[in-house]
Structures are given as C-alpha cells and as structure tokens.
Amino acid sequence: MKKLLILLLLCSPAYGQRINPESFYVEEWCSRYAGETEVVLGDRTRVDCVTYYHAIEFDFADKWAESVTQALHYALVTGKRAGIVLIVEDPQDMRFVERVRNIIAAYSLPVDVWVTD
C-alpha cells in the first residue's frame, strides 16, 4: 500500500506546478536586456534583475500584488526606476496584468510593466 501511494504521488502532477521556475524567466529576460541578476542590496533584499535604468521584480502573474511593493522598494533603494516582469503561463493570467496596470495608472506610480510567457 505504501509503495502504491508513493507511485501515485510521483506520477501525478503537482497542483499549481509552474511550467518553468521564476529563475528561468529572470535569466532569459535579464540577459536579453544586459541586466545583472540577483543583485543583493544594502538592506539584504535581492533584486531579480538590475538594468541601466531599472530595478526589476519578476513574479508569476497571480502574485501581482507582491510585485508592486517589491519593485517600488527596489527602486527606492537603488535610485533606479521600478520595473515588474509578470510571468504569464496561461492566457487567463492576463487579468492579473490588467490589475497591475490599472493600479499603476490610477495612482500614477513610476513603475514599468512587461509581460513574458
């Protein structure tokens, strides 16, 4: 019985499993735009990608709310413009992108948003 349970767990996909880990998207996007990945700041926070103009937070689209505050914090500490790359793995995730864009526009937040899939 124990072996059957282990076999079933190994063969079934994990709930909420991502197509690729966040780091996959960070490496691909950041290298394309000549950025530096995993930059540790003086307060020990870690920016996913820093480019010449931006301090960028990467998150899966359903974690949109976290990305806004993190990006603003990184911008404050680095003196760069805040950036967010939302990872969209399902077309339905675009609703989260719209939420972020609406909030940024409504409050005139200095944040740029990109989408990757």
Task: List each language-model region with its residue ranges.
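Nucleic-acid nuclease catalytic cores
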Residues: D59-A65, L76-D117
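Short glycine/proline-enriched coil/turn segments at helix->beta-strand junctions
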Residues: Y33-E36, T51-H54, V77-R81, L109
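Conserved catalytic cores of phosphodiester-cleaving nucleases, focusing on short active-site segments
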Residues: C49-F60, Y74
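Sec-dependent N-terminal signal peptides
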Residues: K3-P13
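Acidic-basic catalytic patches of nuclease active cores, encompassing PD-(D/E)XK
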Residues: A14-Y52
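A general lysine-centric signal
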Residues: K2-K3, K80
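Short, surface-exposed coil-to-beta transition loops
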Residues: E66-Q70
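Active-site phosphate/pyrophosphate- and oxyanion-stabilizing loops and adjacent acidic/basic residues
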Residues: E27, L72, R101
